[in-house]
């Protein structure tokens, strides 16, 4: 195979895979989905966020790793909406993360201001709830947010 790196101007990993599919006529989508899913190594998204001290920018990253679960979701249009949940749940096992997870970690590490995180978030209300201490049924973000002395992402 060949290593292909490309840039697409999209807002997140889900929009990226949808954009890739939209490059083909609709009558070819059922043929393209399996090909795309088996050939996709991963998607890395990047948003540059102003630092808390205003001296530069720090990357907030979104990572979707190509694996069996990703392939399954990419092949089935009904499961495409589950990709974001998989990215949150697969953080410790696969190294995946959403933009919002990365933004929250940057806030908690003191790298960026909460206001900047909310302005750049895909789902700002989820970050507000998390910062207010309101938890969901599973606290997926806590499994990813680095503790003092550890880091999942170089910042």
Language model segments and positions:
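Short, flexible helix-loop junctions that flank or precede catalytic/ligand sites
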Residues: 2-155
